[in-house]
């Protein structure tokens, strides 16, 4: 059984995120739209493809979307959770696919701009949709309460994958990563 680590952004570390200039979704610093509008850079995230319920057909993602970052001069992240989505660089997506990330719930190419519509990076990014109920949970949390309302201090898997998603709500904005990848990530 492989030991896993949680790889994501802790809501308790907003100060650390601010130092690294990672935009904070919870504070409205990230807006997503199908068409960039300089008068409404952060519209409500209410598109046919942005929300769906179990049992209904999941609408296809658009070919591209705009991600607008407030107060940004550049892009300072490889992945960023946004509701039931991840904004992630193509480089990061390629890396996690190499180590077992095989989920495919739909994605759009992302154009990252500031509030003036100026391009913030030439690097390719994607908006990757996550469908919680489609995730086969291959993770064991030995110290998690039966009601799954808490966070576990330990997680393990028997999966061949080294990068997994969890169907546990508390881990929805994070990746579960095999400890043996720690050094590769730091490269």
Predicted regions and their residues:
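Phosphate/anion-contacting hairpin/loop surfaces
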Residues: 1-187
């Amino acid at each position: 059984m492989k030991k896993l680590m949680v790889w994501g952004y802790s809501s308790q570390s907003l100060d650390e995120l601010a130092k690294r200039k990672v935009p904070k979704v919870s504070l409205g610093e990230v807006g997503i739209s199908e068409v960039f509008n300089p008068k409404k850079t952060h519209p409500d995230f209410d598109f046919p493809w942005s929300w769906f319920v179990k049992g209904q057909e999941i609408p296809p993602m658009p070919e591209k979307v705009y991600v607008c970052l407030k107060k940004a001069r550049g892009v300072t992240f490889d992945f960023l959770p946004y509701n039931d989505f991840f904004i992630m660089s193509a480089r990061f997506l390629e890396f996690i696919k190499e180590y077992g990330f095989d989920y495919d719930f739909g994605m759009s190419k992302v154009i990252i701009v500031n509030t003036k519509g100026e391009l913030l990076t030439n690097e390719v990014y994607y908006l990757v949709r996550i469908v919680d109920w489609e995730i086969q949970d291959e993770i064991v949390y030995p110290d998690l309460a039966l009601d799954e309302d808490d966070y576990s201090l330990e997680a393990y898997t028997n999966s061949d994958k080294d990068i997994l998603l969890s169907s546990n709500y508390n881990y929805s904005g994070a990746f579960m990563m095999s400890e043996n990848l720690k050094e590769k990530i730091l490269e």
